[in-house]
Amino acid sequence: MADLDDIKEGKDFGIDRPQQNTLYTLKGCGSLDWGMQSRLARIFNPHSNRTVMLAFDHGYFQGPTTGLERIDLSIAPLFADTDVLMCTRGVLRSQVPAATNKPVVLRASGGNSILSELSNECVAVAMEDALRLNVCAVAAQVYIGSEYEHQSINNIIKLVDAGNRYGMPVLAVTGVGKEMTRDARYFSLASRIAAEMGAQFVKTYFVEEGFEKVTASCPVPIVIAGGKKLPEHEALEMCWRAIDQGASGVDMGRNIFQSSAPRAMLKAVKKVVHENLNAREAYQFWQEEKQGELK
């Protein structure tokens, strides 16, 4: 029996209006498949096209480093305040409740330690397991200028090929070769190579001079590494300068979980990244939040 809806007149087909197609505006990602864009849209805030990632994957080569002795005590209280979690699959399965419902960037390279050559890494996670864990991206180091440069680039290529097959973005993390200087020229080289190999976004270090050239010459989003622990005002200054010079976010670990007020620091970093607070304003915000956190 025909439904009345089939013969009813007066439907609005919008014949006078062309269909609107919403473009995905994240840098360099407009032509990616839907699944890839969907995962990236969970990592990068669709309104700001920026992200704040909480890195606590250090144990994959450093073991129980300061601040990460007990993930459940030091990191779990920060889950609610970050945009993204960056960790290993071991910690994800054992320490992160599925109900946390935060996008995850999964550490997918390893096979080394602080006692050996750091650049000697392999792909340490099968793409099928990353999919099983429902993560939003996988991450691997790329060591340009190191003894194992070719191997690290090949790791990125393998992950990119598998990621393209399944709609999984790849984050390339620029490690520093022993013979290379930490300057804009080196990080421009490393970041560009990672992007050319197909990484959908790149994590690199902020440099005092020429960082705007690093971001400008990389065709995909760059997030900065937090690096070693700095005084809070210096870390916030670094965040602000990086965002001002074209970074699409930060991936911070030690400058968050080793802070005297970690949750306040994480909130202050988000203020810089998403609300464009300058370093002075963010530091004042941190001081105010710190009082409440330490009560």
Curated annotation (Swiss-Prot):
Keyword flag Cytoplasm: yes
Compartment(s): Cytoplasm
Any GO CC annotation of this UniProt entry: cytoplasm
InterPro entries referenced in this protein's UniProt entry, alphabetically: Aldolase_TIM, DeoC/FbaB/LacD_aldolase, DeoC/FbaB_aldolase, FbaB-like, LsrF
Catalytic activity: dihydroxyacetone phosphate + acetyl-CoA = 3-hydroxy-2,4-dioxopentyl phosphate + CoA
Summary of subunit composition and partner proteins: Homodecamer.
Function: Involved in the degradation of phospho-AI-2, thereby terminating induction of the lsr operon and closing the AI-2 signaling cycle. Catalyzes the transfer of an acetyl moiety from 3-hydroxy-5-phosphonooxypentane-2,4-dione to CoA to form glycerone phosphate and acetyl-CoA.
UniProt cross-references to HAMAP family, sorted A to Z: LsrF
Protein name as catalogued: 3-hydroxy-5-phosphonooxypentane-2,4-dione thiolase
Organism annotation: Klebsiella pneumoniae subsp. pneumoniae (strain ATCC 700721 / MGH 78578)
